A protein has these predicted regions:
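Active-site entrance/lid segments in N-terminal catalytic domains of soluble metabolic enzymes
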Residues: 2-177
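Conserved active-site-proximal phosphate/metal-binding subdomains
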Residues: 158-179, 185-339
């Protein structure tokens, strides 16, 4: 083992122990993409796969977890959206299958959800978009945090990964394992965040074009062709409708989302829907638009959620090779620093 590999192993030890994987690299949960095939491939290759529950019903999640278990006996997790109207039922499905790790995304854990997850012995991971929230989540009993910057694909916050990492890691990384996400495409960046105290990292965009990913060939081609500047954040058109920005490749669906926002804002105005229902309508819009892109391969009208690291995705390759490349780059970077 080289000096770089030895250093990398040492820096990833905490994340590896927490996840039960061989390397502290999680595959970010991406709706329609992060299903049994990619999740199992990720865990089988030594990383940590996450099922994206998204808008799934409890029955669908039940089948997806069971399906994943037929493809891997390694640990994997499930990512749940906090605003899902059947969140507690989804947590029960995870418990039934003894899922080892549950990620809650999209806001603070609703009352009772945290206890329900922990009661079944699962480890709970939450997103911390600010230091104050990170501290609050730790006090409430969360087992680990993901710090994700605005470079990420899909739903994003307003602050960059590098700034969030500098703000949050020195303050909380000794209390709980912290995984850094957003805009990571190479191992050198992984090494940098590990040096700052991260327990590991989470990448999504980098794994979309994995051979094992079921994303449509057109969807993968769009990623391989795209550069960082093509992955743009959606614009909020009505301040009364608090829509979380979404980063995706520019196409016709970018425009249709603006129209959808106007339509939902009007329904709010006319008192035809409550705020919670309005936000759910937006989420269902994304679920449908993503399906169009990922599954149907309609890259003009479907959503192409992608992070700014998309320019570093240059070909289709197996998950194991992507992980090996990232680990080699990270080890090389740490070796150079030792010199």
């Amino acid at each position: 083992m080289s000096i770089g590999q030895e250093r990398l192993k040492r820096r990833m030890a905490r994340g590896v122990e927490f996840l039960g994987s061989e390397v502290a690299i999680m595959c970010g949960a991406m709706s329609w993409v992060s299903e049994r095939n990619l999740v199992a491939a990720m865990s089988n290759a030594g990383g940590f796969g996450l099922i994206a529950c998204g808008a799934m019903t409890p029955e669908l999640l039940d089948a997806e977890i069971a399906g994943t278990k037929t493809l891997t006996n390694k640990p994997f997790g499930v990512n749940l959206i906090t605003m899902h109207p059947m969140l507690m039922d989804l947590i029960a499905v995870c418990a039934k299958h003894q899922v080892s790790h549950v990620v809650l995304a999209g806001g603070l854990p609703p009352a009772g959800s945290l206890d329900a997850i922990k009661a079944n012995g699962a480890k709970l991971i939450c997103f911390a978009p600010a230091l104050s929230l990170a501290k609050k989540l730790i006090r409430s009993g969360v087992d680990a945090l993901v710090v994700e910057g605005m470079e990420a694909g899909g739903h994003i916050g307003p602050v960059s990964t590098s700034v969030l990492a500098q703000e949050i890691l020195p303050e909380v990384s000794e209390q709980v394992p912290v995984f850094v996400a957003g805009g990571i495409g190479r191992g050198e960046a992984i090494a940098g965040y590990l040096d700052q105290g991260a327990a590991g990292v989470q990448l999504g965009t980098r794994f979309v074009c994995a051979t094992e990913s079921i994303a449509h060939p057109n969807f993968k081609k769009a990623f391989i062709r795209a550069s960082a500047r093509d992955a743009v954040a959606s614009v909020q058109i009505d301040p009364r409708l608090p829509v979380i920005p979404v980063r995706a490749l520019k196409n016709a669906s970018t425009e249709s989302f603006t129209a959808k926002q106007r339509e939902v804002a009007q329904l709010l105005d006319e008192g035809k829907v409550e705020m919670m229902e309005a936000q759910l309508q937006i989420e269902h819009y994304w679920a449908g638009a993503l399906r169009k892109g990922v599954i149907d391969g309609d890259v003009d009208n479907g959503s192409l959620m992608a992070g700014q690291s998309v320019g570093m995705v240059t070909r289709e390759e197996p998950v194991a090779e992507i992980i090996a490349t990232l680990m080699a780059e990270a080890a090389h970077a740490l070796e150079k620093r030792a010199a």
